From Swiss-Prot:
Entry-linked CDD domains: RRF
Function of the molecule: Responsible for the release of ribosomes from messenger RNA at the termination of protein biosynthesis. May increase the efficiency of translation by recycling ribosomes from one round of translation to another.
Protein name listed in UniProt: Ribosome-recycling factor
UniProt GO cellular component terms: cytosol
Any one biological process term the GO annotation gives: cytoplasmic translational termination
Length: 185
C-alpha cells in the first residue's frame, strides 16, 4: 500500500517536472528552435492544428527558422497565423518557403522571460509539494486505520520527502539552465 502511494506520488512529481520542461521550451531564448512555433495554431480543413502538422519546420541557422507548408494553399494561412501569434516574429515569404528571422532579445524582454521562467518553476515546486502533502495525508490515514505502524509511517514520510527534494532540485537546475540560456547574447 505504501509503495502504491509512493509510486503514484513520484509519477505525478515527474509529470510536473516534464510539464515544466515543455513550458520552458516555449519561452524564447533568441535562438531559433522549432518548438517556438508549437503554440501557433492554423485552421486546416476546419480544425485547429499546430504549424508543425501542416509544414516542415527547420532551423536554417542559429537565428533563422524555415517553414515550408506541404500544400501551396496553406502558405498564406501559416504566414498569417505566425504574424498574429504573440511570439514576436515576422516571416519573410519567398515562394512557398517562409524564413523567420529571430530578432535578438532586448535586456528588458530577457528579464520578462526570466521572470516568467521563475514563475513557472515556482508553480511546479508548489505542485510537487502539494503532491507530497497528499501522499503524507494518505500515509497518516493508513496509520490511523492501523494498516501501517508508526515506524512505517515515518519511513514513508522520509521516502516521500526525499523524492520531493530530488524533484525540487531538478526544477532548480532546469531554472538555472534556462536563466543562463536567456542571458546569453
Amino acid at each position: 500500500m505504501i509503495d502504491e502511494i509512493f509510486d503514484d506520488a513520484n509519477d505525478r512529481m515527474t509529470k510536473s517536472v516534464e510539464n515544466l520542461e515543455s513550458n520552458f521550451a516555449k519561452i524564447r531564448t533568441g535562438r531559433a528552435h522549432p518548438s517556438i512555433l508549437d503554440a501557433v495554431k492554423v485552421d486546416y480543413y476546419g480544425s485547429e492544428v499546430p504549424v508543425s502538422q501542416v509544414a516542415n519546420v527547420n532551423v536554417e541557422d542559429a537565428r533563422t527558422l524555415t517553414v515550408q507548408p506541404w500544400e501551396q494553399s496553406m502558405v498564406s494561412v501559416v504566414e498569417k497565423a505566425i504574424m498574429t501569434s504573440d511570439i514576436g516574429v515576422n516571416p519573410v515569404t519567398t515562394g512557398n518557403v517562409m524564413r523567420i528571422p529571430m530578432p535578438p532579445l532586448t535586456e528588458e524582454r530577457r528579464k520578462e522571460f526570466i521572470k516568467l521562467a521563475k514563475s513557472e518553476a515556482e508553480q511546479t515546486k508548489v505542485a510537487i509539494r502539494n503532491i507530497r502533502r497528499d501522499a503524507n495525508a494518505d500515509f497518516k490515514n493508513l496509520n490511523k486505520d492501523k494498516e501501517i505502524t508508526d515506524d512505517e509511517l515515518r519511513q514513508a514520510e522520509e521516502q516521500i520527502q526525499k523524492a520531493t527534494d530530488e524533484h525540487v532540485s531538478q526544477v532548480d537546475q532546469m531554472l538555472a539552465k534556462k536563466e543562463e540560456s536567456l542571458m546569453e547574447i
